[in-house]
Amino acid sequence: MASQGTKRSYEQMETGGERQNATEIRASVGRMVGGIGRFYIQMCTELKLSDYEGRLIQNSITIERMVLSAFDERRNKYLEEHPSAGKDPKKTGGPIYRRRDGKWVRELILYDKEEIRRIWRQANNGEDATAGLTHLMIWHSNLNDATYQRTRALVRTGMDPRMCSLMQGSTLPRRSGAAGAAVKGVGTMVMELVRMIKRGINDRNFWRGENGRRTRVAYERMCNILKGKFQTAAQRAMMDQVRESRNPGNAEIEDLIFLARSALILRGSVAHKSCLPACVYGLAVASGYDFEREGYSLVGIDPFRLLQNSQVFSLIRPNENPAHKSQLVWMACHSAAFEDLRVSSFIRGTRVVPRGQLSTRGVQIASNENMETMDSNTLELRSRYWAIRTRSGGSTNQQKSSAGQISVQPTFSVQRNLPFERATIMAAFTGNTEGRISDMRTEIIRMMESARPEDVSFQGRGVFELSDEKATNPIVPSFDMSNEGSYFFGDNAEEYDN
């Protein structure tokens, strides 16, 4: 990779820093999550939450959403210019759940955004701490990835629901910066670009004038982000072509969808980081842990350690299975919605089941749900082993871009084979030659055809005991090679709707 010299690690993106050494990165990431923890503690004090209520993941999510909303400048400006009935642009709030006489009750709270911003800045040494905000966005995005399916969104942009494993980060806001771009899947980027091109087709002024210039810059930037996710020269060359198009239209949409399909075998590199709910950082800070001094990494043992000794609760609906609710949150915490279930199960130490078999709905509770019947349970977020998170698509033989893993986007750097049904994927390409420049297409299809399902990815990489913090003794698991585990098989999850 030619750009290796300029690549920043994701901790640097996360903290907005320039190139730093490992210790500085650990310290600045530590400062970021410590700030989130301090903010959370302060909010619990403001809201007079008991210890138990403060550990409730639904309360954590409400508090996180309030601070994200308080700092959403674009939306705040929009709300002030377009006042809508019953929405105070200067206030933010949400449901807080309290324990009263052995029952859970919902209380809707409202706060001045200014006040929330003040508390957040105070917890972050007076700074805006955008990195911490992005971190919370990524946690929400990971939770959405584990909870909802995006079939409708895929179909609307002309993609195939089978491409769901490319959709990591599809609910991240546009303002999530470099750290957000790093965790977006190939399908997510393609979808954003296709939507943009469609707007340009329908609205003549989209690419024109002063605004059009800004639009064009955004378009090219998104193309470059997507290009950087591809690992083969032919895929990148096609991206150059899409980016340089004078007037992007249907030909570009065709090319992008072709590229998205190709990413099912020639995986893009997508970053994974373990972003935890604010209450987890709050608990650690409250117990006297100094994140900045100790240092912290989103891709190593630290999040596993933290979850190992945090007790987090969740509201449970009458017919939900608490173990399944725990699995959902565990996957969200480790950004493992698109990981092979064989790998996740091994690391977690308990069987991780596909989403179609989960008896649980999302974590958030709608305002019209009946609280009378709500119970709460401890979430089991501990793991048997830990593993390093990856930012590659799992290409085999020394990252020479051959096959990555289909219908999964590997999260953990752990050796596994890549079982995939080549026939199914190649079927998606038959007769689809009407785009342009068929030589790049031919090259991409040739690479896909030569990918072998028995290839091993992440060769020699293993998991580690939780006592092995320096990652000295990798344990390389052996998996049943015939059996691929995608989380999305037999899917019946709800759609994600804003």
Swiss-Prot record:
GO biological process terms held by the UniProt record: symbiont entry into host cell; viral penetration into host nucleus
Compartment annotation: Virion; Host nucleus
Keywords: Capsid protein, Helical capsid protein, Host nucleus, Host-virus interaction, Ribonucleoprotein, RNA-binding, Viral nucleoprotein, Viral penetration into host nucleus, Virion, Virus entry into host cell
Region named Disordered: 1-21
PTM notes: Late in virus-infected cells, may be cleaved from a 56-kDa protein to a 53-kDa protein by a cellular caspase. This cleavage might be a marker for the onset of apoptosis in infected cells or have a specific function in virus host interaction.
A GO molecular function held by the record: RNA binding
Positions of short motif Unconventional nuclear localization signal: 1-18
Gene Ontology cellular component list: helical viral capsid; host cell; host cell nucleus; ribonucleoprotein complex; viral nucleocapsid
Positions of short motif Bipartite nuclear localization signal: 198-216
Disulfide bonds: none
Similarity comment: family membership: Belongs to the influenza viruses nucleoprotein family.
Assembly: Homomultimerizes to form the nucleocapsid. May bind host exportin-1/XPO1. Binds to viral genomic RNA. Protein-RNA contacts are mediated by a combination of electrostatic interactions between positively charged residues and the phosphate backbone and planar interactions between aromatic side chains and bases.
Function: Encapsidates the negative strand viral RNA, protecting it from nucleases. The encapsidated genomic RNA is termed the ribonucleoprotein (RNP) and serves as template for transcription and replication. The RNP needs to be localized in the host nucleus to start an infectious cycle, but is too large to diffuse through the nuclear pore complex. NP comprises at least 2 nuclear localization signals that are responsible for the active RNP import into the nucleus through cellular importin alpha/beta pathway.
Listed name of the protein: Nucleoprotein
Organism: Influenza A virus (strain A/Fowl plague virus/Dobson/'Dutch'/1927 H7N7)
